[in-house]
């Protein structure tokens, strides 16, 4: 693949600074850190660094984003390059009251919509589930949250979630359900699975989905990250939110940044599975 670089940032002069900065949602940071580590071996004279926290937008050279993200605060960025996909799964705390209420239930897309969203326009054939009314939904309010993608997958807006909104990174959603026995949320695969063991992170439990029997075990608490990635790359159930993830550069970025982007396309995508992302198809 080629970026087809013919813009000013590919043709312009190098900047004086040898440091380039990247901002990323937490779910993609381990992958970005791997890119930085590997790219340094090919061009040691240029350093790429992850920006933690809010950071100054003017100081950011590259931004990891996804297709449904609200880019209202990224007007100075363009030339987005998609390198993979993230999947989002509903979760609760293992052995919690919410897990007990949902035990044995295999939720289809309509039931998931009823569980997570305000019920003003549900289909007539979707019976009301009283157990759902007891459950507290936690969703992210940050612009980099997967909440918008999750909502759009079910034909909803992020403003339609039931329950409580959590500011900050989506990893805090895991903390929220750990503290609330009735809490249910959703998160990207790399926030749900341990990237080393490839199993669910300690204390988490997947909400059961209405999937074919040969797939159901992989989406249970006994499943592995690699099982899930393989299944989702061969088919995309309506119950699972999948969103393209890309990297975009600032309009003032220089040739060093363009070389890094080209390297990501040619070499960086081979690390997608290792860090919990699907490959593009």
Where are the regions that the model predicts?
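Exported/periplasmic ABC-transporter solute-binding proteins
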Residues: 4, 8-44, 53-57, 79-81, ...
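N-terminal pre-domains immediately preceding structured catalytic cores
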Residues: 46-50, 63
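N-terminal post-signal-peptidase region of extra-cytosolic proteins
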Residues: 65, 71-77
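Extended substrate-binding grooves/exosites of carbohydrate-active enzymes
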Residues: 60
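Glycine-rich nucleotide phosphate-binding loop and flanking beta-alpha elements
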Residues: 70-72, 192-193
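A short, hydrophobic beta-strand-centered structural micro-motif
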Residues: 64-66, 184
């Amino acid at each position: 693949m080629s970026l087809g670089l013919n813009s000013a940032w590919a043709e312009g002069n190098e900047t004086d600074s040898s440091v380039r900065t990247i901002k990323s949602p937490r779910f993609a940071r381990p992958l970005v850190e791997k890119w930085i580590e590997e790219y340094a071996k090919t061009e040691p004279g240029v350093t790429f660094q992850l920006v933690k926290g809010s950071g100054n937008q003017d100081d950011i050279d590259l931004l990891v984003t996804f297709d449904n993200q609200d880019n209202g605060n990224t007007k100075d960025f363009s030339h987005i390059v998609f390198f993979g996909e993230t999947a989002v799964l509903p979760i609760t705390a293992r052995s919690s009251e919410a897990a007990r209420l949902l035990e044995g239930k295999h939720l289809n897309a309509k039931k998931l919509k009823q569980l997570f969203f305000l019920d003003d326009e549900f289909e007539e054939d979707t019976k009301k589930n009283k157990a759902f009314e007891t459950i507290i939904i936690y969703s992210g309010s940050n612009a980099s949250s997967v909440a918008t993608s999750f909502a759009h997958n079910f034909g909803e807006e992020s403003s339609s979630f039931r329950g409580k909104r959590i500011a900050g990174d989506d990893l805090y959603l895991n903390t929220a359900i750990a503290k609330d026995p009735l809490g249910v949320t959703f998160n990207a695969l790399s926030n749900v699975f341990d990237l080393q063991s490839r199993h669910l992170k300690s204390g988490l439990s997947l909400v059961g989905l209405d999937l074919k029997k040969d797939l159901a075990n992989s989406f249970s608490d006994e499943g592995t990250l690699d099982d899930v990635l393989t299944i989702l790359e061969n088919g995309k159930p309506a119950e699972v939110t999948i969103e393209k993830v890309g990297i975009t550069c600032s309009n003032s970025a220089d040739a060093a940044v363009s070389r890094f982007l080209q390297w990501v396309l040619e070499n960086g995508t081979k690390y997608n599975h290792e860090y919990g992302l699907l490959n593009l198809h």
